[in-house]
Amino acid sequence: GQSPFSSYDETGAPVYNGTATPAINNASGYKSNDPYSNRDPRLAATVLYNGVNWGNGIINVLKGQRDNPQGNANATPTGYYTRKYIPEVILNNNHTGSNYRNWIIIRYAEILLNYAEALNEAGGSRADVLNAIQPLRDRVGMTAKLTDRSDLQTIADRRNFIRKERTVELAFEDHRAWDVRRWN
């Protein structure tokens, strides 16, 4: 469903106010008629969604429409396809069907997130915790300083934010199930 993708906010304000029936938070900048604009740039780098250009076509996942660049009507039930780590070269007609990639065991982003989480849980300073995460957001052009945010004052607030950042940054890297188990 939508819940993992609601973590991709650009303004820092959560998209939803509630948990049962989502109530849109006006401060988030979310627009139901254009749900992919003004979002964390990592969303577009992670998933393909309706209307996005990819390869030699436009993704169209609407019911009864062509939903992939090859024109097959095998729509994804979620409305999303994985984009992260999928090179567009595989759409080339001359492509052999193989694409070998080295598996990344650990990324610097994970090290920063692990450090921020450990620092937060150990009662580290607010500035140190948030400054550990800042390079991840700077890298994608979200340069608003986390230390300027007023909603990350408590350890619990920062814990939730770090968990959201892990969901976004480490999407499709086999961390989510282990993170959820560790957090519960």
Where are these predicted regions, by residue range?
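Acidic/polar-rich alpha-helix caps and helix-coil junctions
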Residues: G1-N184
